[in-house]
Amino acid sequence: LQTIIQKINYKLISKFKECWIIDDESINLAGSLSKPKYLPQKSKYIGTLSRFKKIKSVKKYKLVAIVSGPEPQRTIFEKKLIKVMQKSNEKMLLALGKTESYETKKINNLTIKSFLNSNDLNIAIQSSDLIISRSGYSTIMDLHKLEKKAVLVPTPGQTEQEYLANYLKEKKICYSIHQNDIDLDKIFKKSEEYSGFSNSKKRDKIKWEDLFSLFQNKRKG
């Protein structure tokens, strides 16, 4: 069935001038999701994308946890994190991603922010020793851009997240656990065995003017 669906998708893709793949071909963050055995014709890797940028930061937190994703797993994840993080003697931050409110709550050494804008989240991530988050691809690209050590907790039932978490765990980049098994002592200990994300590897240089020349040529025509 998967092969049939792939053939149908590739036939539809073939009608376009190019197929852009959001990954770095040499680094291959997404594993077989961006590098299957067979690629569509006229495919082009355009590198990874992130809203964040590297900045100088002072370490403020031992751990920053980021909640995201659909309900009901979002709330389950949030409650589990609060339960374990509020018991820690270390300074920690929990970002809930709830855009409908801007509230701050403190429980012992845990600060809970209902919402952080992109700039504040960028700063928070870089001021922490370790990140806990879901393993969605956009999150992974952000963590890679900022060269962070992370523990990935895939949303149960989301096969893409489960694959990416396992793939990066096998590559010894990120430790990964199920949300029911979150244990801070174990997380801190196990995360030391993983390298974290690094931008030090040679990346494919993307010429954006060449990519967007497709649209310029179409406009001229």
Residue ranges and their predicted role:
Residues 115, 145-194:
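Nucleotide-sugar donor-binding patch of glycosyltransferase catalytic domains
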Residues 8, 119-120, 139, 183-186, ...:
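Short acidic active-site motifs
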Residues 120-163:
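A donor-sugar binding/catalytic signature common to diverse glycosyltransferases
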Residues 35, 47-130, 140:
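Donor-nucleotide binding loops and adjacent catalytic segments primarily
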Residues 185-221:
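C-terminal amphipathic helix plus adjacent low-complexity
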Residues 32-33, 101-103, 139, 159-165:
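Short, glycine/polar-rich helix-capping loops at beta-to-alpha or helix-loop-helix junctions
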